[in-house]
């Protein structure tokens, strides 16, 4: 994982009102996590956060550079990113979903399995979606039993969980 790799925290879903506020689709913990960042990369420009509040299915935000509804609408679909190095440090046993995506997976017996294609959470904990070399996917719960170890280079999956 590289410190400069961009991490997408939200996407602009459209305008909210007439004063340049935007609706955001969030990819993280919630609107409050965006407050930790003052500037976001938005394609070929930077946006400075003025305010953000929770809203139905996401958040509503105001940025210094967006003055009216037309400017807000023009940014629909824009991804808001920060460098990986700007994220808070992790404690033992913690991980960011984007750090796992793309990592190769091996079984506890050492055999290659595939790679992490996605990390989902449907409310009961994180689930790794692993894609095999043949393109077929299977899911594994992100628990010590199913995934005994992982690091920045590889994810080890208990052989009993491999389909």
Curated annotation (Swiss-Prot):
Annotated S-S bridges: none
A Gene Ontology term for the protein's cellular component = ribosome
- Please report the stretch or stretches of sequence annotated as the PRC barrel domain: 92-161
Which InterPro entries does the UniProt entry name for this protein?
A: PRC_barrel-like_sf, PRC_RimM, RimM, RimM_N, RimM_N_sf, Transl_B-barrel_sf
Q: Which GO terms describe its biological process?
A: ribosomal small subunit biogenesis; rRNA processing
Q: What is the annotated localization of this protein?
A: Cytoplasm
Q: Mention any Pfam family matching this sequence.
A: RimM
Q: Does the keyword Chaperone apply?
A: yes
**Source organism superkingdom:** Bacteria
* Gene Ontology molecular function, alphabetical: ribosome binding
Keywords associated with the record:
Chaperone, Cytoplasm, Ribosome biogenesis, rRNA processing
Q: Which NCBIfam families match?
A: 16S_RimM
Q: Which family does it belong to?
A: Belongs to the RimM family.
HAMAP family recorded for this chain?
A: Ribosome_mat_RimM (MF_00014)
Subunit: Binds ribosomal protein uS19.
Swiss-Prot/TrEMBL domain comment:
The PRC barrel domain binds ribosomal protein uS19.
What is the stated purpose of this protein? An accessory protein needed during the final step in the assembly of 30S ribosomal subunit, possibly for assembly of the head region. Essential for efficient processing of 16S rRNA. May be needed both before and after RbfA during the maturation of 16S rRNA. It has affinity for free ribosomal 30S subunits but not for 70S ribosomes.
Q: What is this protein called?
A: Ribosome maturation factor RimM
Q: Organism, per UniProt?
A: Sphingopyxis alaskensis (strain DSM 13593 / LMG 18877 / RB2256) (Sphingomonas alaskensis)
- Lineage of source species: Bacteria, Pseudomonadati, Pseudomonadota, Alphaproteobacteria, Sphingomonadales
Record gene name: rimM
């Amino acid at each position: 994982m590289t410190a400069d790799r961009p991490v997408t925290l939200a996407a602009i879903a459209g305008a909210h009102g007439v004063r340049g506020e935007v609706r955001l689709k969030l990819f993280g913990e919630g609107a409050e996590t965006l407050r930790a960042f003052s500037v976001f990369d938005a394609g070929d420009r930077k946006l400075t956060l003025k305010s953000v509040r929770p809203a139905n299915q996401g958040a509503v935000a105001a940025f210094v550079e967006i003055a009216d509804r037309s400017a807000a609408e023009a940014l629909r679909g824009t991804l808001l990113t920060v460098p990986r190095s700007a994220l808070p440090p992790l404690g033992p046993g913690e991980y960011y979903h984007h750090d796992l995506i793309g990592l190769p997976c091996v079984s506890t017996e050492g055999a290659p399995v595939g790679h992490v294609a996605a990390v989902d959470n449907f409310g009961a904990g994180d689930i790794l979606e692993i894609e095999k070399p043949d393109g077929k996917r299977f899911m594994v719960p992100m628990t010590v039993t199913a995934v005994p170890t992982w690091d920045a280079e590889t994810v080890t999956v208990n052989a009993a969980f491999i389909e």
